[in-house]
Amino acid sequence: MNLKNNTDQIKRDLITGSRRLSNYWWAITIGLGSSGFILAGISSYTKINLLPFTDTTQFLFIPQGITMLLYGTIGFLLDIYLWLLILWNVGAGYNEYNKKKGTVSIFRWGFPGTNRRIEVIYPIEQIQAIKLEIKQGLNPRHSISLKIQEKNEIVITPIGYLLPISVVEEQAANLASFLNIPLDSNQ
């Protein structure tokens, strides 16, 4: 979480969405790999070598060429999906804690359509506690949640980031101190 626009009355945490370095890496890698598979499949059908670093004209179109063409097409569709996620910046947004208005606002960008803008606003009085959850093991999880009265918990840490425990603990303690709300730790 990036911190920006913080004063003694307003605290805003910016959330990075799909425009992460890892998503750019995977989009480029899958795009290059799927292009290679598609060109290999077409080369095996036309018997014209379209890949300069290997001779794929020796493959039989059925079954090797058509299989490579199928894998390349699936990879290309996945690549388009990743680039659209990056373009739309799905998951980006902010968490704003406004003591002046007495509200907590959680905003995220979603997929295009009627619900592209996802925003929930709660009065600070409805927040019972800041919950810190730390799980170790094969699927570790370090997250901060808002415990809302008569509602579910709302996770406010970005998904896909595994911050060090000390950083998550410090963020949770700072938020609890800022909102003057108890910190509930589940370790």
Swiss-Prot record:
Compartmental location: Plastid, Cyanelle thylakoid membrane
NCBIfam families: PRK02542.1
Protein's membrane topology: Multi-pass membrane protein
HAMAP family named in the record: Ycf4 (MF_00437)
Designated name of the protein: Photosystem I assembly protein Ycf4
Chief location of this protein within or outside the cell: plastid
Pfam families in the cross-refs: Ycf4
